[in-house]
From Swiss-Prot:
Subcellular location: Cytoplasm
Disulfide linkage: none
Keywords: Calcium, Cytoplasm
Organism ancestry: Eukaryota, Metazoa, Ecdysozoa, Arthropoda, Chelicerata
Main location group: cytoplasm
Database matches in Gene3D superfamilies: Metal Binding Protein, Guanine Nucleotide Exchange Factor, Chain A
UniProt-recorded name of the protein: Translationally-controlled tumor protein homolog
Record's keyword annotation contains Zinc: no
Amino acid sequence: MLLFKDILTGDEMFTDSVKYKLVDDCIFEIECEHVTRKVGEVALDGANPSAEEVEEGTEEGTESGLDLVLNMRLVETGFSKTDYKNYLKTYTKALMDKWKEDGKSEAEVNEAKSKLTEAVKKVLPRIGDMQFFLGESSNPDGIVALLEYRPNKSGGETPVVMFFKHGLLEEKQ
């Protein structure tokens, strides 16, 4: 199994168990589905069951959302277009520092930066219609997943989550 992790935070963003594609060697796109599923009982540390009220059976709730967001425990955040542009400046610099730290050559760093710039140019015009997600750690310095709803053949919309390829580390499990 392949695991795609945020290079900067180590957060797990997605695995190859989902249907994904690489667009123009710069953006991973994952088609998601809305799901509703049961949530198991949560035991609180330090709770004394004998002191609690006796329950008849187990209460199970449900959670709804996008399968990828729920499975990877992504955390929704918000950006204005200006805030997102400012984030991109900081993020690009942090990525370049990380690439150099990891021993990438100047040519490899320039190629990765070029691909990242290409990816940004593709998504920036549509940024006002997108939702944003951080990894499980909610670290604002890491990669931000972009969610966009696209028209599909049946007349509805398909949720598509996008990640910049060069902000992810591909790890074999």
